[in-house]
């Protein structure tokens, strides 16, 4: 609802709180994303995980390598308002009550799949173990459970601790990591298992999925907003 909250703005950057910015954020704001509604980075963790990839393709209804992470968004607010995206979102949510594992992220991917500009991966680097290492990350997103204030040896943790040391919260953060014990870590592992199990159950279940609702995608043609179902007629 950022577009409605700030009607005087035509563009905005949204960033999750579990992030570290290593470059001038104005560079992200200045990216030319053409006529796209959103600029975002592909979610490599979700796309490479077998269960989540199955979920993306069967529930969200898009290809796994087109699914983006909504933790960092460049937003074309004029286009979002033009498409009445907030109203469409509320209508879909009220009518279908989609079951999903990442509600806001899934809605953006399902509704706006053809309106997303893929940003350079350096603008949303996630510390997933086994993933591609980015030598010069512009923005690090400590997504899911890989938080350096909870765990040691997290990829890109040095950037977080560099800035933490310059803040007044460094001693508290060190204490918090030391106190994050076996019970908390076990809970994280169990929660990840539950998330994956839920994704699998939704994908293989009989409930209404985003992919079942053809008209949920937005097509903007010469300033006139239509559902993709209309565009196909």
Where are these regions (language model features)?
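Surface-exposed acidic, glycine/proline-enriched linker/cap segments
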Residues: 47-61
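GT-A fold catalytic core of metal-dependent nucleotide-sugar glycosyltransferases
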Residues: 1-48, 74-75
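A short linear-motif detector with a strong N-terminal bias
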Residues: 16-20, 50-54, 96-98, 117-122
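A generic local secondary-structure boundary/capping motif
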Residues: 2, 60-64
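A generic fold-level signal
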Residues: 7, 14, 33, 65-67, ...
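A glycosyltransferase accessory/donor-loop signature
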Residues: 69-70, 75-233
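Short, surface-exposed, charged loop/turn segments at secondary-structure junctions
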Residues: 29, 54-55, 87-92
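A short acidic (Asp/Glu
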Residues: 25, 51, 129-130
């Amino acid at each position: 609802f950022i577009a409605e909250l700030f009607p005087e703005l035509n563009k905005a950057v949204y960033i999750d709180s579990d992030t570290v910015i290593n470059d001038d954020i104005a560079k992200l704001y200045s990216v030319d994303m053409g006529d796209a509604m959103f600029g975002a980075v592909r979610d490599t963790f979700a796309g490479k995980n077998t269960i989540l990839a199955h979920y993306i393709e069967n529930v969200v209804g898009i290809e796994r390598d087109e699914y983006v992470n909504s933790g960092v968004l460049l937003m074309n607010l004029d286009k979002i308002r033009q498409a009445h995206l907030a109203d469409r979102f509320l209508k879909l949510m009220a009518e279908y009550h989609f079951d999903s594992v990442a509600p806001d992220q899934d809605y953006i991917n399902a509704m706006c799949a053809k309106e997303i500009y893929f940003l350079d991966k350096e603008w949303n680097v996630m510390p997933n173990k086994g993933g591609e290492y980015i030598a010069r990350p512009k923005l690090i997103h400590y997504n899911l459970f890989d938080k350096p204030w909870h765990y040691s040896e997290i990829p890109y943790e040095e950037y977080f601790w560099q800035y933490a040391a310059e803040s007044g919260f460094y001693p508290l953060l060190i204490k918090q990591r030391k106190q994050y014990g076996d019970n908390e870590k076990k809970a994280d592992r169990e929660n990840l298992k539950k998330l994956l199990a839920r994704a699998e159950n939704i994908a293989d279940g009989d409930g209404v999925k985003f992919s079942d609702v053809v008209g949920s995608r937005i097509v903007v043609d010469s300033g006139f907003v239509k559902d993709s179902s209309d565009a196909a007629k």
